[in-house]
UniProtKB/Swiss-Prot annotation:
Record keyword Acyltransferase present: no
SUPFAM superfamilies listed in its UniProt record: Chaperone J-domain, DnaJ/Hsp40 cysteine-rich domain, HSP40/DnaJ peptide-binding domain
Top-rank lineage group of the source organism: Bacteria
Keyword terms, alphabetized: Chaperone, Cytoplasm, DNA replication, Metal-binding, Repeat, Stress response, Zinc, Zinc-finger
Protein name: Chaperone protein DnaJ
PROSITE patterns (alphabetical): DNAJ_1, DNAJ_2, ZF_CR
Length: 382
């Protein structure tokens, strides 16, 4: 299937969000569900919608699909979320290779998966905004998000309470039907998903009134999250079992929280190291002073030696961000910025001229500022 077809099947743009994709999938799957739509091509369209969502509804598969331009390519790919999902480059849709293709036509069918095997649910992503300080010190918070959960009425089997799914009468529970075709090479056999059970191997005679036989229902889920001290912008945390419900008794997927850390107006951060600019006067820089410096852990005193030049950096050990795996904190690096006064009164200018004279310097500048300052100084002289 060409790249544009998958998005076209769901009727969404290529830059559609996951919410838009999921909304389109639910609408179309309900529209073409064979139990609700008796049109001859409903089952085929239902399968197309399902196949499209299997790829576009998974962030990693979608990324691989967008890059490779084929649905088969999207079924492999590298595992996402820091190795949480192992993967590789898929061949023939991630199956067993050429032998499966050969057996499909000549009767082997050896590459088909058990349709009744448990399948884990989808993983979800959640972006969490943090202030600079919250990322440094961590916090506990509760988050809410929508997810597909196991139906509380039927327990996930899709059947009306008091009933159970039964083995599909068409495929005998295999999930596939075999067709035979006469060709110049002889009589060939191929397997296709069962049109009755749609590959599940089971029929639901009386559907659950809550979920309509899907076994899932949407819920507003709440979970408490403990954010460790020292997380950084773009990092993510995995919460096992907080994703969406699986199929055939498969477990829930995982939730991946991606942190978005707001910048600080005072500090800059690089990993566990924090950087801060400290203003001092030229008198403090010349004579030295004990300066109060801001850190994320509170104010501290920094001894600035006499003769300190602008751009000099001091290290405050242990005043940086915590290391995620323990072993204390990083450091804060304080860069000195010497501030030159702009508006001097007459006494200050005279003192500086005396200083320049004592230093053997010849200074031609007047040291006077704008007209307002000149008038103010003249008034003070009187």
């Amino acid at each position: 299937m060409a790249q544009s077809d998958l998005y076209g099947v769901l009727g969404v743009a290529k830059d559609a969000s996951q919410d838009e994709i999921k909304k389109a999938y639910r609408k179309l799957s309900k529209k073409y569900h064979p139990d609700l739509n008796k049109a001859p091509d409903a089952a085929e369209k239902f399968k197309e919608v399902q196949d499209a969502y299997d790829v576009l509804g998974d962030e990693q598969k979608r990324a691989n699909y967008d890059q490779s331009g084929s649905a088969d390519g999207a079924q492999g790919g590298f595992g996402g979320f820091g190795g949480g999902q192992q993967g590789g480059f898929g061949g023939f849709g991630g199956g067993g290779g050429f032998d499966d293709i050969f057996n499909q036509f000549f009767g082997g069918g050896g590459g088909q998966r058990n349709p009744n095997a448990p399948r884990p649910g989808r993983d979800l992503q959640y972006q969490m905004d943090l202030t600079f300080e919250e990322a440094i010190f961590g916090k506990k918070t509760k988050i809410k998000y929508n997810r597909e959960a196991q139906c509380h009425t039927c327990g996930g089997n899709g059947a009306k309470p008091g009933t159970s799914p039964v083995t599909c009468h068409q495929c005998g529970g295999s999930g596939y039907v075999t067709t035979e075709t006469n060709t110049p090479l002889g009589r060939m056999r191929s397997q296709q998903p069962c049109p009755v059970c749609h590959g599940t191997g089971q029929e639901i005679k009386e559907k659950c009134p809550t979920c309509g036989g899907s076994g899932h229902e949407e819920e507003r889920h709440e979970v408490e999250v403990t954010i460790p001290a020292g997380v950084d912008d773009g990092q993510q945390m995995r919460l096992q079992g907080q994703g969406e419900a699986g199929q055939n008794g498969g477990g829930y997927g995982d939730l991946f929280i991606i942190f978005k850390v707001q910048p600080s107006k005072d500090f800059r951060r690089d990993g566990t190291e924090i950087y801060f600019d400290q203003d001092i006067s030229f008198v403090q820089a010349t004579l030295g002073d004990d300066v109060t410096v801001k850190t994320v852990h509170g104010d501290v005193k920094l001894k600035v030696p006499a003769g300190t030049q602008g751009g000099t950096t001091f290290r405050l050990r242990g005043k940086g961000a915590p290391r995620l795996r323990g072993n204390g904190n990083g450091d804060e690096h304080v860069t000195i910025k010497v501030v030159t006064p702009k508006n001097l009164n007459k006494g200050q200018r005279d003192a500086l001229r005396d200083f320049a004279k004592a230093s053997g310097e010849s200074v031609t500048g007047s040291g006077k500022g704008n007209l307002f300052n000149k008038m103010r100084d003249k008034f003070n002289e009187n």
